[in-house]
Amino acid sequence: MPEATDLEELKRGTDLVKRGFARMQKGGVIMDVVTREQARIAEDTGAVAVMALEAVPADIRKRGGVARMPDPENVTEIIDEVSIPVMGKSRIGHRKEAEILESLGVDMIDESEVLTPADDEYHTDKRDFASPFVCGARDLPEALRRIREGAAMIRTKGEAGTGDVNQAVKHQRTIKTQIRTLTGLNHEEREKWAREHGAPRDLVHETAEAGRLPVVNFAAGGIATPADAALMMYHGCDGIFVGSGIFGAEDPEAMGTAIVEAVNNWDDPDELADIASGIGKGMKGQSNEDLPDEEKLQGRGV
C-alpha cells in the first residue's frame, strides 16, 4: 500500500488526475465568490465548487482599471470556510499569479480573460503545474490550443459580467458545429483542417473520433437565470459557471438554489417553471450588442 506522500503525489499532477478532478464537477454549478460569506451561501445553495476572485465580472466592468488575482488572504479564508473545492482566477500569461494560487492550495486555476491579460501573446504553460486549469474558448481551435497547453477543463467565454447569455450560446454552438464537421472528415482532411485552423493535429483526431472535446466543457459568460443555465445544458454543456448572476440578483440564496435545481432538471419544463417562480429579480445585465468592441472581454487570449 502506498505511503501517504505517495498518495498525495498520485492525487495531483498527472493529466489523468487533473482531468479526473474536472470530470468530478460534471452536472454541477460553480459560483463566483468574493468573500467567505458568499462562499458559505454558494455551498449552502448547492454549488459543487466556488471561484474566488477580487470582484465579480459585472463589478470589474463598472470600476475599470486593472483586474488581478484575488488577495491570497481572502483565498485562504474562503478555503477555510467551505468544504467544497475552491478555484481561483489568474491573469492570462501570468505564471506567478498561477504559482501563488497553487501554493495556497486551490483545487483549480482559471486562466481567465475576465482579468486583465499579463501577456498578449502567450498563455501560461499549464503542463508545468500540479493543479488543474480551466480556460475559456470561443471555438474548437481555441479550445484545443488550451488543452494542448494543459487545460483540464474548457468553458465557453461568453461575455462575462453582462447577464446576456447570447455569446455563451454562440460559442457552444460553434464548438459543437466544428466537432460535427470533423467527424465527417477523413484523416487527410482532418490534417488539413488542423493546419488551416492552427489546432493541434493529435487533438483534432482525438476529438473527431470521440465526437466531443477530450475534456469536460462547461458554460460560462452571461448566465443569469435558471432558464439560462437550463439552456446551456440543453446545448450539451457538462456544467455551469455563474459569475455575477448569483450575487447580482435580488435574492442570491434563492437564485443560487434555483440555478442548481435548473441544471439538475434542465429537460423538464414543468419543473423549470416551478424552480424559476418567486425567486426575485435577476441581475440587471447589459446586452452584448450594446458593448463597444473595446469593452468585450471574450477576444482576450486566443
UniProtKB/Swiss-Prot annotation:
InterPro entries: Aldolase_TIM, PdxS/SNZ, PdxS/SNZ_N, RibuloseP-bd_barrel. The keyword Lyase applies. It comes from the Archaea. One of its GO terms (biological process) is pyridoxine biosynthetic process. Pathway: Cofactor biosynthesis; pyridoxal 5'-phosphate biosynthesis. It catalyses: aldehydo-D-ribose 5-phosphate + D-glyceraldehyde 3-phosphate + L-glutamine = pyridoxal 5'-phosphate + L-glutamate + phosphate + 3 H2O + H(+). D-glyceraldehyde 3-phosphate binds at R173. D-ribose 5-phosphate binds at D32, G161, G222, G243, S244. It is an enzyme of class 4 (lyase). Residues 278-302 are annotated as: Disordered. One of its GO terms (molecular function) is pyridoxal 5'-phosphate synthase (glutamine hydrolysing) activity. The active site is at K89. Gene3D superfamilies: Aldolase class I. Keywords: Lyase, Pyridoxal phosphate, Schiff base. Pfam families: SOR_SNZ. Its EC number is 4.3.3.6. CDD domains: pdxS (cd04727). The keyword Lyase applies. Catalyzes the formation of pyridoxal 5'-phosphate from ribose 5-phosphate (RBP), glyceraldehyde 3-phosphate (G3P) and ammonia. The ammonia is provided by the PdxT subunit. Can also use ribulose 5-phosphate and dihydroxyacetone phosphate as substrates, resulting from enzyme-catalyzed isomerization of RBP and G3P, respectively. NCBIfam families: PRK04180.1. In the presence of PdxT, forms a dodecamer of heterodimers. HAMAP family: PdxS (MF_01824). Belongs to the PdxS/SNZ family. This is Pyridoxal 5'-phosphate synthase subunit PdxS. It comes from Halorubrum lacusprofundi (strain ATCC 49239 / DSM 5036 / JCM 8891 / ACAM 34).
